[in-house]
Amino acid sequence: MAAMECRDKAVVPPRRLVQARLPFKRLNPVPKEKHDAEAEGKKGKCSKSGLGQSKDSSTDTLHASTDNMENDCQLNSDVNFVPKLVNGKGPLDHFIQKSTKDNTDEIIVIIDSVDESNQRLSDDVDHVSFDSKASSAALTNGMLGKDMNKLSCLNSTQNSQTDDSMQTDVPCEAIANKGEDLVDGIQSCSGLTERNNLENTKVNQSELKDVIFEGKMPVVLLEDIMAAKSPQVTSLDGSVTSENETVELSHEGDSVLTNSSLSSLSVSSPEAQPVAETKRNTSPLAVSTPVRKVSQKLHKSSAEKEKLRLQRDQERADKLQKLQAEREEKGRLKEEAKAAKERAKEEAKKKKEEEKELKERERREKKEKEEKEKAEKLRVKEEKRKERQEALEAKLEEKRKKEEEKRLKEEEKRINAQKAEITRFFQKPKTPQAPKILAGSCGKFAPFEIKENMVLAPLCRIALYPDFLEQLDRLLRAQNSEVSFLRDLKCRKPRKTGPTFVNSSTDTVNSDVVVVDNCKTDAVPERGKFGRMKLLQFCENHRPAYWGTWNKKTTMIRPRNPWSKDSKLLDYEVDSDEEWEEEEPGESLSHSEGDDEEEGEDEDDDDGFFIPHGYLSEDEGVTEECDPENQKVRQKLKAKEWDELMAKGKRLHVLQPVKIGCIWESAQNDSGTNADLKILQQFTACILDSSVAEEEQQIQKCSKKRAKDQQILGQLLPLLHGNVNGSKVIIQEFQECCRQGLFSDVTAATDCGDTSPVSPNTSRPQTPVGEDSGVPSKARLKRIISENSVYEKRPEYRMCWYVHSEVLKSFDQEHLPVPCQWNYITQVPSSGKEDGGSVPGVAPVQSTPVSVKRKSTGSMCITKFMKRPRDAEQAEAMEMDGFQADTEEDEDDDDCMIVDVQPCKDSTLTVTETAPESRGTTAAHQDASMVSPSNTV
């Protein structure tokens, strides 16, 4: 049994303590003598049935969980715990009322009933075989009434000890030994009472089996039968004293076991089987011992047992208190540990949160720091960029200022060069001044300036001949102290040399006139005067190579030291290649002037004066310190002129100056002198006398001119006033009318008058217009129109020509209609018709063909071969709103045409018109296909 408890302790958890229910008596008890036999029989049956039922239920309850045990036990107790009444008696009545009164001192029956599940009983019954003989002996020999109170107290202490033994670590071996002692005592007692109770057991066995274990309510029955012990087993008395400590009927007192059942329980365990076999072998000895001896020993040891029992009770109480204190201490420690664990958990959580917050703060601070550093870096970078930008802008501004200054200087130099180029022909060339040379090696004399036409005299004027030098050497070798050199000097006559003359080579170079005798036409200046031409060129330089003369000589650079530097002659710190800048192309002065200069150029070409490219005059060879750029501009202009002349293929010849000396009157008859006189006569000065007649003629001419203008204006008023066309159309129409003789008065007036002067602003006329033909010039008509009328917009009509009111009044032409009603004889542009509008009374346009015989080919109007767009004329007419339509300059430009008549293979005309740039028209080239057959040559 003890071994079983050791095995079940690990499986079944500790149970809570339940107060034991003490046995009670019925109010109407049945006599004990009547039911002794029935009790013995029922007890035997109960043990067998309990054993069988416990074996079946043990397998199910072992696997049940601890939570479902109490529920199952409570369910079973509610349903099946109601025992069947036999003759109005329950199962407890059979145990309380016993008929064995003779052996009351020897047998002690203990009944313990606790309200608990029968799981513990099922576990115990699996290991116990119920002995019906032992149980019947216990019932017959038991004495219940005498020791009921004592046994109940003992039973309660045993139950408490059993509960304590489940929670404490009692060795399984001690419990097993105690169980073996208890088995021996029970077996001896069962042997004494076997014969007496055999019949009662058989009678009541069936009833006890049905009553006791019905509903699985176990009752524990213990019998202390130490009196039946034999003398041979007296050595086991020590173990009997502790039998009450180890015997356990049930976990809470719900099972019923006898001493024989405990013996069978201990025998069924593996540890107690050998001991049980030995006891069985010795059981006949125990049965054969007298009962009186056993009872005497039991009486003797009862006092000792009582003391031991009290001592054990005290120990158990102390142990219970100690266990209770330990349990409370454990609970308190557990609570403290739990509280400490909770605190540690809270602290860990708090610490973790603090660490997390700290990390978050550090991360935020780090991020803010990085952002600040980044912002600082960006600010520094932006400041640096701004500084660089400002420095770059300052540098660019400085560079721009320098370029502006340089451009202004170059512009000023260019203007000065142009002025100098123009005025160079009217100024006398300056003679180059000789460089200032200071003579500082003249002994006691102070340094002085060597002026022009001056040279230094030689230090020694005496010419040392070889004979004199030999004599000097001889005298030096044969020196005599007696001979005095001073005496020789006094006796010697002084030597003489010629005067010092200025080098004549400078005169030939700097002379203004060079007489060339028998010079060829294509001769080139002599190179001996200027030195050899040299080319200084380096492949790694951007600066153009130098091709010219280099007459400077150095005393520092020699063949033995070619890498030495001559700082006096050259400046090694300045890199001329870096200072080189590509110059802009200069303006060509050859075509800057008007067409009037072309005639002058043709006349200048006849002079035969030409300077070849690369030729340096006397004044050009000298570098001016004040204006070094002027010479470059001149050279560029001369180079361009040279290229232009070479392109034209003009002949080059060297100028031959002529010197004519004085001519005497006596030598006039000489043929050579007469030729010179003819040359000089063209430059003869003439005395001119001013006369009054010329002024009067000029006044008369002006008066005639004004009168003629008035006559022309009188005939022009009907055509001019209210005309929407331009001045060009009006002038063309008026001239055509004059050619056809429509204005007889004007023609007659022009015939008797002088020729009208041509305006200086007019260029070549389109047709040869003059007084011989009776047609006024275009410039004259244009001047008259501009002086007496204006092209503007008025309420009467839109844009047209309006003659001044005073002019109309002076000619009595105030009634002229607006627009004009003129019958045109020439072709008028369509824009004029549209501008004029369809006014009733206007005659249709009449296009009278002009005979080719009356006009030369050069006098034909080029506009006949052109078709100007209608929109262009309308745009021109609308743009002149509020302003004078045409000016003299505009009309002159319009009429400035170059008509080139070239004979072709097909005998056709090729007409080219060059329109001025001011009107924005393009040149029109007409093929022969656009010329009518009548105009062919």
From Swiss-Prot:
Comp. bias intervals (Polar residues): 59-69, 756-766
Record field: transmembrane: none
Outcome of gene disruption: Cells lacking CHAF1A show delayed S-phase progression with retarded DNA synthesis and defects in a rapid nucleosome formation of newly replicated DNA.
Biased composition (Acidic residues): 574-586, 594-608
Compositional bias ranges of the Basic and acidic residues kind: 31-43, 301-386
Residue window of motif PxVxL motif: 213-226
Biased composition (Low complexity): 255-269
BP GO terms, sorted: DNA repair; DNA replication; DNA replication-dependent chromatin assembly; nucleosome assembly
Pfam families: CAF1-p150_C2, CAF1-p150_N, CAF1A_acidic, CAF1A_dimeriz
Region entry Disordered, spans: 21-69, 250-386, 574-614, 753-778, 831-851, 910-937
Superkingdom of origin organism: Eukaryota
Keyword list, A-Z: Cell cycle, Chaperone, Chromatin regulator, DNA damage, DNA repair, DNA replication, Nucleus
Function: Acts as a component of the histone chaperone complex chromatin assembly factor 1 (CAF-1), which assembles histone octamers onto DNA during replication and repair. CAF-1 performs the first step of the nucleosome assembly process, bringing newly synthesized histones H3 and H4 to replicating DNA; histones H2A/H2B can bind to this chromatin precursor subsequent to DNA replication to complete the histone octamer.
PANTHER family according to UniProt: CHROMATIN ASSEMBLY FACTOR 1 SUBUNIT A, CHROMATIN ASSEMBLY FACTOR 1 SUBUNIT A CAF-1 SUBUNIT A
Domain notes: Contains one Pro-Xaa-Val-Xaa-Leu (PxVxL) motif, which is required for interaction with chromoshadow domains.
Protein family (similarity comment): Belongs to the CHAF1A family.
Subunit organization: Subunit of the CAF-1 complex that contains RBBP4, CHAF1B and CHAF1A. Interacts with CHAF1B, PCNA and RBBP4.
Protein name: Chromatin assembly factor 1 subunit A
The species this protein was found in: Gallus gallus
